[in-house]
Amino acid sequence: MRPLEGITVLDFTQAYSGPYCAMNLADYGARVIKVERIETGDQSRFWNPYAANGNSGYFAVYNRNKEGIAVDMSEPEGKEVIKRLYGKVDVVLENFKFGTLDKLGLGYEEMKKVNPDIIFASITGFGQTGPLKTNTAYDNVIECMSGFMEMTGFPEYPPLRSGASVADSYTGLTMALAIVLACYDKKRTGKGRRIDVAMLDTMFATIEDAVLAYALTGKEISRTGNAKPREIVPYDTYYCADDFIA
């Protein structure tokens, strides 16, 4: 038996951070029901690499082990389907733009009417309460605004994005942990909760001591290539006769 068996998640997410979160929950045994828009579906269905049959390998990997339905949530019939599902699941996970489910009449207050102890988990770029809450964001925007790009690369070149979508993946893992903790707490207290994980907050938490260094010294950590900007030597990549070595 896998550790999350018995937990059911209604997954409204698309692209990467949310599906990656739900994928991890499904891998550990949660039943994940993925909800997509009719006709278009998840935008990552159109992301490469593609399999020989023309389907997106990207979508297949990050949405493995999930069940799927397509619902038009703008129609009354679609809203009723979603409300019935609210009554049968433990967790709702979404990464819509701020306020989208509320505008559809399917927000947290509606969830609690049919399932008072539900866990409602929201991933956004900038959270549910701040001045940027209505802004949308992709990984590169968050890497830039968090200072991650300013720290990455060589000093003689412009700031550099990570080779992988680290803001998305870190956020997905952070939310997965938050959901597991909320489920554990619900077993003790019988109460659900609302979870708010912002990509920007997550990246601030992952840039190690950059924020701390600025708070203590007023100095910004600059780009140092592959060297460690601390008193650790040797810590770099070095070109040797046959290739690089770290």
Predicted regions and their residues:
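N-terminal helix-loop segment corresponding to the beta1-alpha1 unit
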Residues: 1-191
